[in-house]
């Protein structure tokens, strides 16, 4: 009997070693297995093991590295007698906390299918695996495993159900997540605040605030009290949907229930007020969070800087950046890009360019957003070659320009009188990109009109319907105004009548296009 188990272990060892190499290659490229470590692996596998896994478990797995955790699991699989499932769970949990979810799944499959090794999962094991399937965006596999665990006589609990709901939410299968949550009571599982908060958060992230509010109502009806995470998710969703009055009501509701807001709650409100130019509200919320000893995070500070820049209070924005750094909060690329835009808006172009140029020295790597801002600044300063140089730098350094990058270049070329270059680049864009939007075409139409090419611009406007791009209020306004300015009254009146009859009723725009 011992011989057959030893044979099984030997064959399984090869499988584990192959699996180890696979994950080192595919799951974590930063890990390299040294020859000495490979030797120790085989020594552990075939020499009766000199290390007692119990000692390792007793010392704790809080700071264990992936390589060591993997080897510990293999060592345990080779041990005789086999360790308990509780001990295996400890190692699987440690690996899962490293976000190596695929490793956990495959390690368990190996030991479960290994000839001569008999071990049965418990509820804790099953919950680990269900969560790992969900984290790998495989909620269907998690659901299948749920069926398997029930066949083994293991009843799922609230942790199982929460993982499943979260898994479907992560995969953006909201209907399935809602369905699973609805089936919980039939499975004998009482819903809790975690499950409903997961649903509310996902619905809000998808701008589905009405269903999110319905989930909130039903959870209250079931006697489940929302917590700070629930309210923060809801307030963030309401703010992003422009429902600031509702967001404020929820904040007051939190206060009445003695639930203290957190940095996420306040940041959502500050960001929403800043984007709508309500600086007095921004100041009020900021003071409130400081009074409650809640430290702003990088998102909060970036929103505060945006609000100040929006009102041309750039010097105050600089002070806010200095305060942020003094508080130990490191600015990110969004923070610097926001402040740079504030400089550009205040005609302090050189200051904005210098700020972005200094970013790498401050330990912040450039990205598409910062490059777009820098291109815009160079064009505003009339430094066309430098602007196009940054654009070229993006393409040669793996920073893929987005449609906004191209739109900034087109607008910059027209603004600097480089009409031919703009037309040439636009022609190239039409051949190579399929994401040209109404902003792209509006820039072209406006630029061509300013270059006395009104007929050509009108022809491009007319062709938009064949490109499946719907002109918006701004596009109609520019085209009608430029046709009038060019003396093409008949065309301008016809376009205005068409807009008033067919377009305006579907838009929330001013009543008259002049």
UniProtKB/Swiss-Prot annotation:
The ranges of the PPR repeats are 122-156, 157-191, 192-226, 227-261, 262-296, 297-331, 332-366, 367-401, 402-436, 437-471, 472-510
Q: Is this entry keyworded Metal-binding? A: no
Organism of origin: Arabidopsis thaliana
Instruction: Tell me the keywords, alphabetical order.
Output: Repeat
Record's family?
Belongs to the PPR family. P subfamily.
Name the Gene3D superfamilies on file: Tetratricopeptide repeat domain
Q: Which domain of life is it from?
A: Eukaryota
Its recorded name reads Pentatricopeptide repeat-containing protein At4g26800
């Amino acid at each position: 009997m011992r011989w057959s188990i030893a044979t099984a272990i030997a064959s399984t060892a090869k499988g584990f070693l192959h699996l180890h190499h696979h994950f080192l290659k595919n799951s974590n490229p930063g890990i390299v297995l040294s020859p000495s470590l490979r030797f120790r692996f085989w020594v552990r596998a075939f020499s009766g093991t000199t290390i007692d896994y119990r000692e390792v478990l007793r010392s704790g797995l809080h700071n264990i590295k992936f390589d060591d955790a993997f080897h510990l699991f293999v060592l345990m699989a080779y041990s005789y007698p086999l360790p308990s499932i509780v001990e295996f769970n400890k190692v699987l949990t440690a690996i899962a906390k490293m976000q190596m979810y695929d490793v956990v799944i495959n390690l368990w499959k190996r030991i479960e299918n290994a000839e001569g090794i008999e071990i049965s999962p418990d509820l804790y094991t099953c919950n680990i695996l269900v969560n790992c399937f969900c984290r790998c965006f495989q909620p269907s596999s998690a659901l299948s495993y749920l069926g398997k665990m029930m066949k083994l006589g293991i009843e799922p609990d609230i942790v199982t159900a929460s993982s499943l709901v979260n898994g479907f939410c992560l995969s953006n299968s909201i209907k399935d997540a809602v369905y699973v949550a609805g089936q919980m009571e039939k499975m004998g599982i009482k819903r809790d605040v975690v499950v409903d908060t997961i649903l509310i958060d996902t619905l809000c992230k998808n701008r589905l605030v009405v269903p999110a509010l319905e989930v909130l109502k039903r959870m209250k009806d079931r006697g489940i009290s929302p917590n700070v995470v629930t309210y923060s998710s809801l307030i963030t969703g309401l703010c992003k949907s422009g429902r600031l009055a509702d967001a404020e009501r929820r904040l007051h509701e939190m206060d009445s229930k003695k639930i203290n807001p957190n940095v996420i709650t306040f940041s959502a409100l500050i960001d929403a007020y800043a984007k709508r130019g309500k600086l007095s509200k921004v100041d009020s919320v900021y003071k409130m969070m400081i009074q409650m000893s809640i430290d702003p995070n990088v998102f909060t500070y970036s929103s505060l800087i945006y609000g100040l820049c929006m009102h041309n209070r750039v010097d105050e924005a600089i002070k806010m950046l200095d305060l942020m750094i003094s508080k130990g909060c490191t600015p990110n690329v969004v923070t610097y890009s926001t402040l740079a835009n504030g400089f550009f808006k205040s005609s302090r172009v050189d200051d904005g360019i210098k700020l972005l140029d200094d970013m790498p020295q401050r330990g912040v790597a450039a990205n598409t957003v910062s490059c777009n801002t820098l291109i815009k600044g160079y064009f505003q300063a009339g430094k066309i070659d430098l602007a196009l140089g940054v654009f070229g730098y993006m393409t040669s350094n793996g920073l893929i320009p987005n449609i906004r990058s191209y739109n900034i270049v087109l607008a910059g070329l027209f603004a600097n009188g480089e009409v031919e270059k703009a037309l040439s680049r636009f022609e190239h864009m039409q051949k190579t990109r399929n994401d040209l939007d109404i902003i792209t075409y509006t820039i072209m139409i406006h630029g061509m009109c300013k270059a006395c090419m009104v007929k050509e611009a009108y022809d491009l406007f007319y062709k938009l319907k064949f490109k499946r791009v719907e002109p918006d209020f701004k596009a109609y306004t520019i085209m009608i105004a430029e046709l009038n300015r060019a003396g093409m009254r008949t065309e301008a009146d016809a376009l205005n009548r068409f807009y008033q009859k067919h377009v305006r009723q579907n838009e929330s725009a001013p009543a008259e296009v002049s």
